[in-house]
Regions:
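Short, flexible segments with low predicted structural confidence
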Residues: 7, 28, 91-93
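Short, charged low-complexity intrinsically disordered segments located at boundaries
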Residues: 1, 29-30, 129, 150
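EAL-family c-di-GMP phosphodiesterase catalytic domain
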Residues: 11, 15-23, 40-164
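Bacterial c-di-GMP phosphodiesterase EAL domain
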Residues: 1-7, 33, 98, 164
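Active-site core of PLP-dependent enzymes with the aminotransferase class I/II
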Residues: 23-34
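Mobile, glycine- and charge-enriched loop segments
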Residues: 32-38, 42
Length: 164
């Protein structure tokens, strides 16, 4: 089915949870590879562990890691060299996003609820964020249908008879 719809590859990103990704079967690995060969990309969601094999992520065509903004902050500890993540004590916390980018992976901080979290995410050099601060989730069906409605004055205009 996806082979027949490769024109969607630039618009579709498959999301998989970190634990599901870690527990993939060989069949799932092959299927991900096939989708990647068709141009589809992947995003790892529900990321809880930051000590990842970035080479493996790149080989699997994972292009995004979605990590909760609060989870990122909860993982930070102070070291003699400055802030680091517990799982990566040899890497400055502010260098984590750059490390991921070297492997073609962008970090998305999610569940950003207030401006304080935005500042904290920016201090980690993370370029993407999402959450209630940027707009609450909303039903899109009504909004999409409203965009396709004809203008109100068009609907209210009287019908004119043709002279003839």
């Amino acid at each position: 089915l996806m082979a027949e719809n490769t024109d969607l590859a630039g618009s579709v990103i498959f999301e998989i949870g970190q634990s599901a990704y870690d527990g993939r079967s060989s069949t799932a690995v092959r299927n991900m590879r096939r989708l990647a060969e068709l141009g589809f990309r992947f995003s790892l969601d529900k990321v809880r562990r930051l000590d990842m094999d970035f080479q493996e992520l790149a080989r699997s065509d994972v292009r995004f890691l979605k990590i909760g903004a609060q989870s990122l902050q909860d993982e930070i500890v102070e070291s003699g060299e400055g802030p680091v993540f517990r799982a990566l004590p040899d890497l400055a916390a502010e260098d984590f996003a750059a490390l991921a980018r070297r492997y073609g992976v962008d970090i998305i901080a999610e569940k950003i609820e207030d401006e304080r979290q935005t500042v904290e995410v920016l201090e980690l050099n993370i370029g993407y964020g999402q959450g209630h601060l940027f707009g609450e989730p909303r039903a899109i069906r009504g909004a999409i249908l409203a965009e396709t409605d004809p203008p109100a004055d068009y609907l209210q205009a009287p019908l004119r008879r043709r002279a003839g």
